[in-house]
């Protein structure tokens, strides 16, 4: 919507962000993405805190107020390319998306490389933009052997390329998030 794009642009400029992403919701209203946190669990690499949270039971997660900490716009380690804003010149200066990561983690890798180059500019998740997203609707889930193998190899490439980031708890959450 125009509101979401305008809000993302304003947030991006206000924080002088290198990358800005949006809170994404499943059609049911559950949280799909609210910024990505690094985890030290090698089989996951990154995850979204409060992913799957039932917003029907926790209305404050969807309200316009900021009563819940993850309902506030915040800095995070990465955002998903499902809704990501970045200046073209910044995108090109770091080489764009890594084509070795054909399906998964190319957005996370982009965020990590952007933050490495532009250390003083934050990656922001704008939670006042709530967008409904049909995760993996067009490409399907990674639920067969071939897709699972590709996902595994792409995760290993990400971890090997940015190994230093996976040796300590997530910088912005201060904890090593367990899986939900």
Go through each PLM region and give its residues.
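Flexible loop/turn segments at secondary-structure boundaries
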Residues: 1, 27-31, 104, 110, ...
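Short glycine/serine/threonine-enriched helix-capping/active-site loop
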Residues: 20-23, 126-127, 134
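Generic recognition of well-ordered alpha-helical segments
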Residues: 7, 19, 110-113, 153-161
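C-terminal, non-catalytic tails of nucleotide-sugar-dependent glycosyltransferases
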Residues: 27-29, 40-75, 80, 85, ...
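Conserved donor NDP-sugar-binding/catalytic core segment of glycosyltransferases
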Residues: 2-46, 50, 120-121
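A short, conserved alpha-helix in the catalytic core of glycosyltransferases
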Residues: 3-9, 67-95, 100-130
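Generic structural signal for alpha-helix termini and adjacent loop/cap motifs
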Residues: 14-15, 100, 117, 161
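Non-membrane alpha-helical structural segments and their capping/turn regions in soluble enzymes
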Residues: 2, 105, 148-152
């Amino acid at each position: 919507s125009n509101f979401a794009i305008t809000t993302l642009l304003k947030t991006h400029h206000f924080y002088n962000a290198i990358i800005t992403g949006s809170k994404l919701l499943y059609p049911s209203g559950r949280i799909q993405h609210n910024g990505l946190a690094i985890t030290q669990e090698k089989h996951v690499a990154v995850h979204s805190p409060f992913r799957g949270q039932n917003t029907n039971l926790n209305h404050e997660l969807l309200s316009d107020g900021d009563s819940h900490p993850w309902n506030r716009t915040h800095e995070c380690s990465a955002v998903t390319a499902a809704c990501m804003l970045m200046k073209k010149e910044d995108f090109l200066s770091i080489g764009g998306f890594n084509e070795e990561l054909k399906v998964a983690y190319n957005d996370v890798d982009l965020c990590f490389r952007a933050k490495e180059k532009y250390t003083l500019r934050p990656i922001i998740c704008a939670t006042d933009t709530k967008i409904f997203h049909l995760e993996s609707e067009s490409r399907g889930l990674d639920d067969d052997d071939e897709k699972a193998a590709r996902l595994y190899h792409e995760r290993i490439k990400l971890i090997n390329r940015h190994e230093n980031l996976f040796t300590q708890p997530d910088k912005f959450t201060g904890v090593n998030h367990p899986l939900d």
